């Protein structure tokens, strides 16, 4: 039996249903109910727009091919011209676990099809569609290409990657950073008691494989919530009520609470650090500072480099790991 929540006379959904039978790394179907009439479309449309435009992803932004001065040329021994190679590289699905720019390469000397599996990457970069064709060598000729991988949001045209004084031979390309391929939502009627004028929201998400649909949905909801926070009055009323008992909004207690209530996004950590912490359900600075260094090092993919990054970020706010603080906000 579904549990319902009422708030100020309005029906609210209590949980999100996930279709586990169809859930994969690239597809997910989610449902939530009941919404008051009209809220299903409002939430569904907002989530769809955020999913398609605002999630962070990785893409190749520039390439450099040995022997090619610009994209309107051909390379001896290569079936495709450079323009076709650029189009193929645009469809290469790249997953980067770092915010910094990375350079990946392709080197081949024998005839045959060059695919994503031939790309040489480092530990922070992964090629998802390894069977994707980049080009075809018709002869045993040396082929060398460098690709610049960056992180970003949405679609960024090649003109924003290029500069007047860029090195000859560097070819900027359009970058599709969004890891979301498609989003579809529908609203249908649902029942609460004897009333049937409520909404049920069904949301389907297709990704490129660099992020799973559940994580994508969570990230989109966080982004939407962060943009709505300034409109929520209790964010301003809370510190005033707290300061009346503690001696002012500028008191040390109030300042500490403000820092502890920050989210991980406020710390501007790297993608790797964020993913590691969120996998442990660490969502706020309050959650983070209560963890010890040893416990964090036990988290998968959380190494000394990431630990030093977290230490440095916390120290900027006068905080450190292993602190003893209240588990719940004081206001």
Swiss-Prot record:
Its cellular-component GO annotations read: cytoplasm; DNA-directed RNA polymerase complex
Chain spans, region Alpha C-terminal domain (alpha-CTD): 255-331
What are the record keywords, sorted? DNA-directed RNA polymerase, Nucleotidyltransferase, Transcription, Transferase
| Alpha N-terminal domain (alpha-NTD): region residues | 1-235
Pfam families for the chain: RNA_pol_A_bac, RNA_pol_A_CTD, RNA_pol_L
Q: Which GO terms describe its biological process?
A: DNA-templated transcription
- Which reactions appear under catalytic activity for this entry? RNA(n) + a ribonucleoside 5'-triphosphate = RNA(n+1) + diphosphate
Q: Which residues are in coiled coils?
A: none
Extract the InterPro entries matched here. Answer: DNA-dir_RNA_pol_insert, DNA-dir_RNA_pol_RpoA/D/Rpb3, DNA-dir_RpoA, RBP11-like, RNAP_asu_C, RNApol_insert_sf
Which superkingdom is the protein from?
Answer: Bacteria
* CDD domains assigned: RNAP_alpha_NTD
For this protein, the Enzyme Commission number is 2.7.7.6
What are this entry's molecular-function GO terms?
DNA binding; DNA-directed RNA polymerase activity; protein dimerization activity
Does the entry feature the keyword Ligase, yes or no?
no
Q: What is known of its domains?
A: The N-terminal domain is essential for RNAP assembly and basal transcription, whereas the C-terminal domain is involved in interaction with transcriptional regulators and with upstream promoter elements.
- Write out the function statement from the record: DNA-dependent RNA polymerase catalyzes the transcription of DNA into RNA using the four ribonucleoside triphosphates as substrates.
Quaternary structure, from the entry:
Homodimer. The RNAP catalytic core consists of 2 alpha, 1 beta, 1 beta' and 1 omega subunit. When a sigma factor is associated with the core the holoenzyme is formed, which can initiate transcription.
Q: Any idea what this protein is called?
A: DNA-directed RNA polymerase subunit alpha
Give the originating organism. Answer: Rhodopirellula baltica (strain DSM 10527 / NCIMB 13988 / SH1)
